[in-house]
Amino acid sequence: MLEYPIAPGKVEAFTTFRDSELPYFVVTGHQVHGTRIALVTDPATDRDSLEGYDALMTNVKGCAIGVRTADCIPVLLYDPVKEAVAAIHSGWKGTLNRISPKTIFRMKDVFGTDPEDLKAVIGPGICRNCFQVGDEVVQYFKGNGINIEPIYSWNGPRQEGSMKGGHHLDLIEENRLLLMECGVPAANIQVSGLCTYEDGRFFSARREGASCGRNINAIKML
């Protein structure tokens, strides 16, 4: 299990490996690559009651919340001032539609969060070198007002069965930039730097197929 020192003694945050066992129950939703955000108030909330939510937040101590990923980008947030946390599932659609900023704005509305106080973790996800996309995805990003220059690369003609050529996007970096645009200090953002496609310790839908297992990315206030 990959643990993050986001606030030792106050918060536990981690990403599971494929052979990890959860240390306790983690509330997760049925994710649909959307931007709906759920406020969780019961540590025993079952997954079926969270249909269609790709981000969860809570201010309940002892309530572990999380998101399931297998190449998509997990973002975990902690507000040490208002004492609240959030877990975000940000695939290319969620990144395109700014689910991370929307979650921060929701935390501001519900908890009074100041983005400058937030501590963030961007967990393992597919890296730019491995995230090959079609031209239509690039156009979606351009059309949605996102400056793709810092996150885009053209790696030459696309070859059948290879991830090396074609268009590539850096969802990890885009989520970091989106957090900073919201006011989260760069120094407060931890990036794991691990690629789920390259690192066999993690499940990867692109490497193994969509029916593979999922990595659990969780956060809990103590």
What are these regions (language model features)?
Residues 1-222:
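Active-site microenvironment for binding and transforming phosphate-containing groups
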